[in-house]
């Protein structure tokens, strides 16, 4: 058992942030990218999520890092979570690079952590990654 990570976004943002995360942290196992393209509809996105989840082990918990609360990627991830109550799925929105790096770090540092524990730590760190230089 482990934690599979799905990076999800409108357009190719998820692909780009996945590439950036790999440049900083190296290639990671159990990471899938889900993109929602302009030519696609909600059912296409739903299928993309199911295909991503199928790449993980059946006992893996799942962490979804989505770009926008109430956006289509979030809505379809929420739908899948509701339809699979026996599967632990946590969804975090506001996707940014510090969030992804922290997800990788949390997963590496504590292999026994639950997806809920990992999500709570990610949120704290991701918020701290938003700064301004006067």
Task: List each language-model region with its residue ranges.
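N-terminal loops that bind phosphate or other acidic moieties
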Residues: 2-134
